[in-house]
Amino acid sequence: MVQRLTYRRTVSYNTTSNKTRLSRTPGNRIVYLYTKKTGKAPKSACGICPGRLRGIRAVRPQVLMRLSKTKKHVSRAYGGSMCAKCVRDRIKRAFLIEEQKIVVKVLKAQAQSQKAK
């Protein structure tokens, strides 16, 4: 005969907080074990990239608070908040903007020297 199962908690509905799995006890009984909700890794701060950040543990917020800092970020500029591709693009953009400023300054200096002659 099949053993009947009952929830161990008061909630009797199939909600996300009431998910269970079957487990066999040493006394050969089958009981419900309550499973924890799965966490999600954070998204990139840029808002453009669709995926989740790599190298960061995907856990619930309460567990994330208890983790050490090495498990919450990667050792890179903007590690733990932006993905590597976005950081690379941001560095390139900043470099090109600085180069453009230098070019403008040089052109202005050349124009000044032309007027002086």
From Swiss-Prot:
Predominant localisation class: cytoplasm
Top-level taxon of the source organism = Eukaryota
The cellular component terms of Gene Ontology attached to this UniProt record, alphabetical and capped at eight, are: cytosol; endoplasmic reticulum; ribonucleoprotein complex; ribosome
Q: Does the keyword Ribonucleoprotein apply?
A: yes
User: What PROSITE patterns does the database record attribute to this sequence?
Assistant: RIBOSOMAL_L34E
Instruction: Tell me where it resides.
Output: Cytoplasm, Cytosol; Cytoplasm; Endoplasmic reticulum
Tell me which Gene3D superfamilies the record gives: 6.20.340.10, 6.20.370.70
Record key words, sorted: Cytoplasm, Endoplasmic reticulum, Ribonucleoprotein, Ribosomal protein
Q: Name one GO molecular function term.
A: structural constituent of ribosome
InterPro entries referenced in this protein's UniProt entry, alphabetically: Ribosomal_eL34, Ribosomal_eL34_C_sf, Ribosomal_eL34_CS
Q: What's any GO biological process attached to this entry?
A: translation
* Claim: Lyase is one of the keywords in the record: no
Q: Quote the function comment for this protein.
A: Component of the large ribosomal subunit. The ribosome is a large ribonucleoprotein complex responsible for the synthesis of proteins in the cell.
On subunit structure and binding partners, the annotation says: Component of the large ribosomal subunit.
Q: Which family does it belong to?
A: Belongs to the eukaryotic ribosomal protein eL34 family.
Instruction: Spell out the protein name for this chain.
Output: Large ribosomal subunit protein eL34
Q: Which gene encodes it?
A: rpl34
